[in-house]
Regions:
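Nucleotide and nucleotide-moiety/phosphate-recognizing core
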Residues: 2-193, 200-207
Length: 208
């Protein structure tokens, strides 16, 4: 197994959801500071990886107009982000796949580097980002952000089997594997790094 570097990582933007809490719009095409969310995500990935591709299930020609390869889920029925990740592994040209959702406009510009450091240090085939959150007691604790993950291609069979058996929860699948943890809680890490927009109000709040 070759350690991840920018040359052997494919960036994968997950934009295939139904956005039910936003009235069913195609979330990746919604504007954030004048730019489509999925396009913003792709551009943030572009400097970190070898190539960027998109996962979308609607308006494919709109996504393709940006110049990136676009792939709909290989499983039917909107099976969730894991289905998008599986599609990424099935269409990955490199040894590693870096997944990000389209609706977190401030994810770190060193995401690939730091997750790569984590898998290299622990010799694992998966790394997951962790970020500070305030819990019900008012304490700040780091929690996993599993949609932000670095996956080795060898995970394709495991993920396919999990989905075929009816599994849909990301945490349940990642728990099947020893995965490296990378905390994004350094002084320069913004508290909004992994904030996502599930509603119009949240999207407006992120715009400031």
């Amino acid at each position: 197994m070759v350690a991840p570097t920018p040359d052997n990582i494919t960036g994968w933007v997950l934009a295939g959801g139904q956005a039910q809490r936003m009235g069913g719009v195609d979330k990746g095409l919604q504007l954030f500071q004048g730019q489509a969310l999925a396009l913003r995500a792709a551009k943030r990935l572009q400097t970190q990886v070898h190539i960027v591709k998109l996962n979308a299930n609607r308006h494919l020609s709109d996504y393709a107009s940006w110049g990136y390869d676009v792939h709909p889920d290989s499983l039917s029925g909107y099976a969730g982000p894991l289905a998008g990740m599986l599609t990424g592994l099935q269409n990955c040209d490199t040894e590693w796949l870096l997944c990000v959702p389209c609706d977190s406009p401030f994810f770190p510009l060193d995401l690939a580097y730091r997750l790569g450091m984590a898998v290299d240090a622990e010799q694992s085939i998966m790394a997951v980002a962790w970020a500070p959150e305030v819990n019900a007691q008012g304490d700040t604790v780091c929690r996993p952000q599993p949609v932000f993950c670095l996956l080795h291609l060898s995970l394709q069979t495991s993920l396919s089997d999990f989905l075929q058996s009816g599994g849909r929860k990301i945490d349940a699948w990642t728990a099947q594997h020893a995965n490296a943890r990378m905390d994004f809680n350094l002084p320069h890490d913004t508290h909004q790094a992994f904030a996502n927009a599930n509603t119009w109000q949240e999207l407006k709040g992120l715009e400031g």
